[in-house]
Amino acid sequence: MSRLILRGARFPGDIAIEDGKITALGTIEVLSGDSVLDCEGDIVTAGLVNTHHHLYQWMTRGEATGCNLFDWLVHLYPVWNELTVEDVYIAALVGLGELAATGCTTASDHHYLVPGGD
């Protein structure tokens, strides 16, 4: 079974990964079939967890900036009321892509909109 060896990260030693699990830490001998990833100077961490997200709000990022919470909600609730099922779907795809690209592997979405009242 091949392993992924993370070498040179800002951790004192190598990290071996097999089947998505860390199997060894420290000085690791590279075996035939292993892949080695040069992580020189990088920080290696487990996947990040976002426990509170509103993915649909990606569609209105940049709107009503500089407002307090109440004014922000007053401005955006009418906008969110017009979102379609497709809008929410696209926002979720983009939002999940951004989370994945920044190291998030688990997210909990707090979705309370019902597009079209369905």
Residue ranges and their predicted role:
Residues D38, N50, D109:
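Redox-cofactor binding/interface segments in oxidoreductases and associated redox assembly factors
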Residues L6-R7, A107:
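Structural detector for hydrophobic anchor residues on beta-strands
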Residues L83-D118:
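Active-site loop-helix segments enriched in His/Asp/Glu that coordinate
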Residues M59-I90:
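Active-site gating loops and adjacent loop-to-helix segments of metal-dependent hydrolytic enzymes
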Residues A46-W58:
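Histidine-centered catalytic micro-motifs
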Residues S2-L4, R10-A46:
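Histidine-rich, glycine-flanked metal-binding segment
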Residues G41, H52, G103:
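Conserved, mostly hydrophobic/aromatic
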Residues L55-G62, G117:
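Short, function-defining helix-loop hinge/capping sites that tune catalysis or transport
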